Amino acid sequence: MRIYNTATRQVEEFTTYVPRLARGYVCGITPYDHMHVGHGRVYVFFDIFRRYLERLGYEVRLVINFTDIDDKIVNKAREEFGHEAYKRWREVPERYIAEYFEMTRRLYIKPAYAYPKVTENVEDMVKWISTLVEKGYAYVAPDGSVYFEVAKVPNYGVLSRQKIEELIAGARVEPEPGKRNPLDFALWKSWTPGEPWWNSPWCPGRPGWHLECVVMSTKHLGAPFDFHGGGADLIFPHHENEIAIARAYFGVDNFARYWIHVGYLTVRGEKMSKSLGNIITLREVLSKHSGEALRLAYAMSHYRKPMEFTYELLQQAEDMAKTLYTAYDELSQALRDAGEKDQEPIAQEALKYAGAFYGALDDDMSTPEAVQQLYGMARYIISTVLHRVEKISRETALAVLNKYVEMADVLGVLERRQIPKELEEAVKALVETRARLRQERQYQLADYIRQRLAELGVELHDFGPRTYYTYRRA
């Protein structure tokens, strides 16, 4: 498999430091507000990436953090709790972390290897800062804040392809009080009255954002690890500063081999923002559409390119999901009608879609092409395999079904394919009754059963004397 590496600006062969073990870190949310569809795009992509690595035989250790203390959280607590914010601020991240797990469950995102929180790792962060100060890469400001000195790190700007001189020119003419350079960033922020704080050798306060991710990722994955990911908006300054910190601490050029970034999501051509009032939350979308439809909608755009979000796209994805389920449901039933041996090369044609599907994912995770191959296989199953299933053996038909499900599992769709046994047995009995009525030419009664089943979300499709059915998933 080949993947684009932001650090080198090239599509590279994916290899890992430890054979068959892929260790990765994706920057998680700052839990101060509802998750939006931009968040969903990032985490669905890395879920598909993780699923594909597992299909290739890797054990995947994916770590996703929660930045559960931040200025935004403090401000939200003040808005909600007023003078009690100092006591109740933890309620804010707890609420939105719970929402994160609800939304990712509804998006069929597999659980991460670990979910570290900043507040549970402050002691480790203080130790890191002490080491950086001792090595001369960080300095203590008069108010007790600690800053990382960017000028001490060679090749700063390597990830974002920016030169330090140009960055300084684009920054403020005068650095903030306590800073030696406008580009220097906080490793430790001194306490402000009314805000949460932790003890440190320098002053009461809390850690800085860029430090947090380096400490938590390497704590769980070691250094160097295989891939580090997030949204494209994190390339600078966040990921650039992570690299600088790790270079100073470990003395290595890069503490992650591949840097993988997901493109922006836009609404009516503009990036989502509160100021524009165009934020679309995951809760809003998932109240109207299935998680699988949203996964397909995301996958229809290449992860590195901007994605325009529309409800028309979601409806298209919903229709596609319905077709995928129809192919699965009906081929599952058609196994009983398969022949004893293969008389036509129907299966070989079906399995060509699988080759193209995996070829697309091997080529920098080209999910738009992979989606089209899965959808193409579904249509081929419906248009050809079901009509001529008696021309292939049961083993061959089962091989087609298994390969189809395997492909769907990589994209995280067909997750609702299991139907309660009682419901399936009841539907099967009604379908058999309808088949007898058709043989007896009692078409009015047969149509009545079809109609009633449709009202219950069961669609019947006749293939000559055979009838297969599909369920409408809620």
UniProtKB/Swiss-Prot annotation:
EC number: 6.1.1.16
GO molecular function: ATP binding; cysteine-tRNA ligase activity; zinc ion binding
Subcellular location(s) per record: Cytoplasm
Pfam family, one: DALR_2
Residues that coordinate or bind ATP: K274
Main location per the UniProt record: cytoplasm
Cofactor binding note: Binds 1 zinc ion per subunit.
Family the entry assigns: Belongs to the class-I aminoacyl-tRNA synthetase family.
Stated name of the protein: Cysteine--tRNA ligase
Gene that this sequence comes from: cysS
